[in-house]
């Protein structure tokens, strides 16, 4: 039986740090389901269809990565995709409080699904979607080293029109 993990996020946009985390999680699990959240209540740079499409493009050559969008409870989506674990990244101690609360709630909702925390590779520890968006607003050309090429193309399209 395959060990499947789900990696949820808004991914607005997906960064090289996210990609690194998926690739490293594949050393532990047979399959990773990248679950793109509808980001209820958030103003996003890209709508969910574009975010999902970019992530599919990033992992198009990896049969062990599946990309889905979801709304509602993460644990329900995990069950739907036969995931035994939720993968989350922890960049800094400041991430821990929120992630610990989410992990605890998910465990209360479904104790069969474990949360696995991975720290980023050092070169990606300061990259976040929020920071990529903040830099892109001022100079989109400066974010090319932080995101996959297909994501940079979308950022360029969005900001070169403004």
Swiss-Prot record:
Q: Which GO terms describe its biological process?
A: coenzyme A biosynthetic process
Cofactor(s), names only, from the UniProt record: Mg(2+)
Q: Spell out the residues of the site Transition state stabilizer.
A: 18
Pfam families in alphabetical order: CTP_transf_like (PF01467)
> What broad class describes the main subcellular location of this protein?
cytoplasm
Q: Name one GO molecular function term.
A: ATP binding
Q: What is its EC class?
A: transferase
Asked whether the UniProt record includes Coiled coil among its keywords, one would answer: no
What are its GO cellular component terms? cytoplasm
* Residues the entry annotates as binding substrate: 10, 42, 74, 88
What Gene3D superfamilies is this protein classified in?
Answer: HUPs
Please give the InterPro entries that the UniProt record associates with this protein. Cyt_trans-like, PPAT, Rossmann-like_a/b/a_fold
Q: Which reaction does it catalyse?
A: (R)-4'-phosphopantetheine + ATP + H(+) = 3'-dephospho-CoA + diphosphate
Q: Could you describe the subunit structure of this protein? A: Homohexamer.
What protein family does this chain belong to? Answer: Belongs to the bacterial CoaD family.
What is the name of the protein in this document?
A: Phosphopantetheine adenylyltransferase
Q: What gene is behind this protein? A: coaD
């Amino acid at each position: 039986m395959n060990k499947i993990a789900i990696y949820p996020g808004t991914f607005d946009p997906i960064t090289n740090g996210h990609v690194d985390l998926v690739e490293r999680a594949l050393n532990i699990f047979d399959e990773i389901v990248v679950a793109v959240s509808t980001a209820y209540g958030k103003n996003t740079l890209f709508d969910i269809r574009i975010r999902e499409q970019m992530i599919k493009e990033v992992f198009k050559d990896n049969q062990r990565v599946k990309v889905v969008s979801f709304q509602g409870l993460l644990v329900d989506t995990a069950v739907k995709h036969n995931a035994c674990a939720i993968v989350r990244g922890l960049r800094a101690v400041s991430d821990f409080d929120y992630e610990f609360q989410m992990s605890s709630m998910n465990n209360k909702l479904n104790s069969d699904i474990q949360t696995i925390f991975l720290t980023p590779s050092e070169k990606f520890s300061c990259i976040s979607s929020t920071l990529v968006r903040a830099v892109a607003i001022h100079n989109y050309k400066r974010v090319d080293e932080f995101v996959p090429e297909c994501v940079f193309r979308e950022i360029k399209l969005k900001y070169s029109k403004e």
